[in-house]
C-alpha cells in the first residue's frame, strides 16, 4: 500500500500451505492489500477448489487458477504475488519489455524474467497453464500489457522481488525516457 505496488483491490497473493504440495492460501477478493489480515486468507485445497471457483464474491476465480496452476507446476513458487504496479505494468506494455542490466536493481532480474505475450486478460485454466509454462524455471513473469507475477521460496523473498522489480522497472523506464 505505502509502496504503491497495487491497483485497487485487483491483486492476488498466495502462499503454499505448510507440509503440502497442493494446498495454498490466497487473499479474499475485494480487500485492499493494506487491509488484509491473516483471517482474510482462504485455504484452497483439492476438496474445496471447485466450490471456491464458484464464489467470486469470496475469492477471485482467476486467482485460484493462476496461483493454483503455478504452485502445482513450478516447484520453486512457494509464494506468488500478482500486481498491476505502475512501473512493471508500463514495462509490460513496451514492444521490448526486457529489463537491461543498467544498475544494481535491474541486474538482479537480468535473464530471470519471462514475458508472457499471450495474456488475454483472464487467467482461466488454459491460460493459467500457459502462464506456468512461460514462467518455467524463472521467478518472474511479465504479463504483456497487464502487470507482473513474482515468486519466491518464502513470503519475504517473494515480496523482496516484488519491491525490487518495481524499482528496477522505474529506473529502466526513467533511463529510457532520457532518449540517451
List the predicted regions and their residue ranges.
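Glycine-rich flexible loops
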Residues: 2-180
